């Protein structure tokens, strides 16, 4: 673990990290999030009987779109040329929840952790949005980075 924040300069002000001199490397990040709900709500999603349509397809597209827009949402995040974004949704009826996983890849000078986290988060938020008419007390939880590869800090895996 590093002992310094990279987005704070010597004067204590927030700044975007200068990556000009960094090497271009293959980078990859995986993240996950969960959304817990009543068994009946999950069944509506799984059976396709939700009145708003295919919840998983909409959440998947929202997550992909969110990864591409991460630098518009996170102020000091660099805009990146993503080469792959994947969002998968898995119903887990035994736990009354959906597990969302994301994968982001690129060849670049900075990592894609924020893009992967944003993809998983927004997919979960989209499920909430589409299902809130049926259930308002759903819980989004355990959003975390699962793995990152590439760059100076090397490989990280939970």
Curated annotation (Swiss-Prot):
Enzyme Commission code(s) on record: 4.6.1.17
EC top class named in words: lyase
Residues forming the catalytic site: 129
InterPro entries: MoaC, MoaC_bact/euk, MoaC_sf, MoCo_biosynth_MoaA/MoaC, Mopterin_CF_biosynth-C_dom
Catalysed reaction equations from the record: (8S)-3',8-cyclo-7,8-dihydroguanosine 5'-triphosphate = cyclic pyranopterin phosphate + diphosphate
CDD domains to which the protein is assigned, alphabetical: MoaC_PE (cd01420)
Gene Ontology MF, one: cyclic pyranopterin monophosphate synthase activity
Keywords: Lyase, Molybdenum cofactor biosynthesis
Binding site for substrate: 76-78, 114-115
GO BP of this protein: Mo-molybdopterin cofactor biosynthetic process
Pathway(s) where this gene product acts: Cofactor biosynthesis; molybdopterin biosynthesis
Family per record: Belongs to the MoaC family.
Subunit structure: Homohexamer; trimer of dimers.
Function: Catalyzes the conversion of (8S)-3',8-cyclo-7,8-dihydroguanosine 5'-triphosphate to cyclic pyranopterin monophosphate (cPMP).
Protein name: Cyclic pyranopterin monophosphate synthase
Species in which this protein is naturally found: Shewanella loihica (strain ATCC BAA-1088 / PV-4)
Top-level taxonomy: Bacteria, Pseudomonadati, Pseudomonadota, Gammaproteobacteria, Alteromonadales
